[in-house]
Amino acid sequence: MTTRTESPTVVQLPPVYFPTALKVHPQIELMEERGLEWMARYGFCSDPVQATRVRDSRSAHFFGYLCPKADPDRLQAAVDWGYLMFAFDDVSSDGDSSALLDIAVRIVRTLEAPDANVLPSDNPYTAPIVDLATRVHRTCAPEHVRRLVDSHTKWLLGAAWECAVRQRPSINDYLSARVMYAGAEPTFTWFQLSEAVVVPEQEITSPRVRALTEMAGTVAAIDNDLYSHGKELWTRQSRSDLSGTGLDLPSCVALRDRIVARFFELRNEVLPTASPALARYLHNLTCALRGNFEWGLETERYSNPDGNHPGAVRTLGSVSNTPSAVGPPGIPSIDWWWR
């Protein structure tokens, strides 16, 4: 339950390392208008607080920063999914793991077979999920559909783990699971669906590309922990972010800086022999690093934590041109990225 504090919560983040600038899709406003209309059509803007929470998620900006060159018509499904899944996250984080697992299995099956009729008819998420699944099957290659199903399976399994765990995890355990329940895998799969050409299987599943995908997802997850830290302080929630494992903010930043530095090092090794489809995927992964961070600082999802208190949280961030640390961090679940 949200508890209001007496004054705004202000968090000053240490500078974070980014060697590239933010890139912005030129048709964000169009995608936002379409996405909000889609959410309203399915009843997710029926009261002022709910409408504010939907709008404040800024899903069009999120994907517009991550995929700045995508066809806006193909990217619209990702934008709509973002609005819906941010709303889903708001309610699923408060439920029990058994209920989450049940709905997760039904969502995954619906993505596989839109006419499966396994989602409850009275669930507000059923109709929009079926709509998204139908659109994907109609417009995307079979390889894209399978990757979307697999990535949702991984994400929802991680979300169920987050809901079920009752003890403070080690850093190693936390990083292994965080990249799953942060939703990075389905987000990056939507990158692929926004392109007509499929990244060949032998490329997308190669160890080096898998490492790049995991690195981008882990940086996004850690940065989410950073820019949502003030929200958790304001709501007086237990520490479910990386700082809950015992790391202070400078140590969290040092860890993500190591990963960002390694990402660019490995990306530059992979790009010269990448197919055009893989090169575009790696471009979007690169944009995701800076785009996710800037979106997190901007979105009212974290500055207005419950939709009723605009400006309740202020998170101040800045960017550095040099990493605060480099090299493998000595964490078994991720050290393989440096090998």
From Swiss-Prot:
Give its E.C. classification number.
4.2.3.222, 4.2.3.224
The alphabetized UniProt keywords are: Lyase, Magnesium, Metal-binding
Note on how the cofactor is bound: Binds 3 Mg(2+) ions per subunit. Mg(2+) can be substituted with Mn(2+), with a loss of approximately half of the activity.
Where, in this chain's numbering, is Mg(2+) 2 bound? D94
* Protein species of origin: Allokutzneria albata
Quote the pathway field: Secondary metabolite biosynthesis; terpenoid biosynthesis
The protein depicted here goes by the name: Phomopsene synthase
Q: What is the effect of changing P68A?
A: Loss of activity with both Mg(2+) and Mn(2+)
Binding site residues for Mg(2+) 1: D89, D94
Source organism's superkingdom? Bacteria
Tell me the protein family, please: Belongs to the terpene synthase family.
Its cofactor is: Mg(2+)
